[in-house]
From Swiss-Prot:
Activity regulation description: Activated by phosphorylation and inhibited by fructose 1,6-bisphosphate (FBP).
Binding site for ATP: T14, T15, S16, T268, G311, Q315, G412
Residues that coordinate or bind sn-glycerol 3-phosphate: T14, R84, E85, Y136, D246
Cellular component terms per the entry's GO annotation: cytosol
Matching InterPro entries: ATPase_NBD (IPR043129), Carb_kinase_FGGY (IPR000577), Carb_kinase_FGGY_CS (IPR018483), FGGY_C (IPR018485), FGGY_N (IPR018484), Glycerol_kin (IPR005999)
Name of the molecule in the record: Glycerol kinase
Length: 501
């Protein structure tokens, strides 16, 4: 027996697959990352090829092991964290997907959502799942596949198909088709799972017309689900022992273990989660109630504000407008101006998420004058991340009656000091950036390590959280209010735009 020295985190994101090795001191020993194809068949539709995701994920596993020179048998366990809601349905006999994976950002099921709302079912879904009826969540995506891909409805009725979010798909592949499971956090994003009773909800499945036989078994976020088939994992059998959706994993990696602690992750989208312990808060302000994780025999809940477009707005400046060479350049250009000169950019490219939930909103740049420069537009795009975060924090404080003391942040954009300073200024609370900003992968590693005794307790893990920098708010309150009022006006102009004539 070789000593177990590492935990491997698989981070299956929206645009890339990553494999990150952590040692016992939670240091990153190796990282491999590879992007995969984004498929846009029609405006507002987004797909991924699930087979390509698997081969990309397997490729980075092999790469990180080769690059670091470690032996696969030194890996104590594997943790998986994933883009949530993205839906794949596959044939359980052949292992082949019946259609591309439908991505969380995809709006194709807007009409299915409208039908559910017209039938007056929104409250029922909200009460049971903690979610709003929106094209974002998995349930309507599964329904769309069964309604639109020829032959799938019959196969589903015969019990020949399986549904999974990306965690489920990867575990199924890694175990050679032996294990069909998900965890509480991912199940809570499907629109089919009752977060109070902790079971798949037959009434909701009836409304969506999805057979129970498709659904995975729901387990805790930290337990041994199964073992890798040696031929699917570099010739070795390693326990898969931790799973959480990417945002819940980041909350765990940020050591937000006490009720009232919150983090904001800046990625493709922006996601703020606040731990609410065993309280299920029903949001009056457009937030989601979700399961943070299942651990030690109990479930922890969270309030979540989901912002669809954050870093993706900067990618659009780079790829769409081509006014940036690379995303990090945004800080350089934005720092060339004192502010936006009255310009606001509302990145509602895929509708608006929390707290507005307007599927028909579209992007807008307002306040343009002849004096507007590319620097102003870049600055306005960065500022939009901070404004959207303020929208969500306001809703969170109203729902929970908890006044946030500080906001922990993570994700790629937190390296941008200008953005982080503006975030602190516009919120009026300190913004805390940790030393390890890979908190999503860290959270998955922690869950997997705890399950096999690689780490003892979450108390031990909480002590490891270290601050890199605290951004203090220096903006005067009247200035903050003036800027934010302008933002609210700009959002109003972007709403209810994409209407059918």
């Amino acid at each position: 027996m070789m000593a177990k020295k590492y935990v491997l985190a698989l981070d299956q994101g929206t645009t890339s697959c990553r494999a990150i090795l952590f040692d016992r001191d939670s240091n990153i020993v190796g990282v491999a990352q590879k992007e995969f194809t984004q498929i846009y068949p029609k405006p507002g539709w987004v797909e991924h090829n699930a087979e390509e995701i698997w081969s990309t994920q397997y490729g980075v596993i092999a790469e990180v092991v080769a690059k670091t020179g470690i032996k696969p048998e030194e890996i104590a366990s594997i943790g998986i964290t994933n883009q949530r809601e993205t839906t794949v349905v596959w044939n359980k006999n052949t292992g082949k997907p019946v259609y591309n994976a439908i991505v969380w950002q995809c709006r194709r099921t807007t009409e299915i959502c409208d039908e559910l709302k017209v039938k007056g079912l929104e409250e029922t879904f909200k009460k049971k799942t903690g979610l709003v009826v929106d094209a974002y969540f998995s349930g309507t995506k599964v329904k769309w596949i069964l309604d639109n891909v020829p032959g799938t409805r019959e196969m589903a009725e015969k019990g020949e198909l399986l549904f999974g979010t990306m965690d489920t798909w990867l575990i199924w592949k890694l175990t050679g088709g032996q294990v069909h499971v998900t965890d509480y956090s991912n199940a809570s994003r499907t629109l089919m799972y009752n977060i109070r009773e902790l079971c798949w909800d037959e009434e909701l499945l009836g409304y969506l017309n999805v057979p129970m036989s498709l659904l995975p078994t729901v387990k805790a976020s930290s337990e041994v689900y199964g073992y890798t088939q040696p031929d699917q994992f570099l010739g070795h059998s390693v326990p898969i022992a931790g799973v959480a959706g990417d945002q819940q994993a980041a909350l765990f990696g940020q050591a937000c273990y006490e009720p009232g602690m919150a983090k904001n992750t800046y990625g493709t989208g922006c996601f703020m989660l606040m731990n609410t312990g065993d309280e299920v808060y029903e949001s009056k302000n457009g937030l989601l109630t979700t399961i943070a994780w299942g651990l030690d025999g109990k479930v922890t809940y969270a309030l979540e504000g989901s912002i669809f477009i954050a870093g993706a707005a900067i990618q659009w400046l780079r790829d769409g407008l081509k006014i940036l060479e690379s995303a990090p350049d945004s800080e350089y250009f934005a720092s060339k101006v004192d502010g936006t000169d009255g310009v606001y950019l509302v990145p509602a490219f895929a509708g608006l998420g929390a707290p507005y939930w307007d599927m028909r909103a579209r992007g807008a740049i307002v306040g343009l004058t002849r004096g507007t420069t590319k620097e102003h537009i870049i600055r306005a795009a960065l500022d939009s991340l901070a404004y959207q975060t303020k929208d969500v924090l306001g809703a969170m404080e109203a729902d929970s009656n908890i006044k946030l003391q500080a906001l922990k942040v993570d994700g790629g954009a937190v390296a941008n000091n200008l953005l982080m300073q503006f975030q602190a200024d516009i919120l009026g609370v300190p913004v805390e950036r940790p030393q390890v900003i890979e908190t999503t992968a860290l959270g998955a590693a922690y869950l997997a390590g705890l399950a096999v005794g690689f780490w003892e307790s979450k108390e031990e893990l909480a002590k490891r959280w270290k601050l890199d920098y605290q951004f203090e708010s220096v903006m005067a309150e009247d200035q903050r209010n003036k800027l934010y009022n302008g933002w609210e006006k700009a959002v109003g102009r972007s709403m209810d735009w994409a209407t059918e004539e």
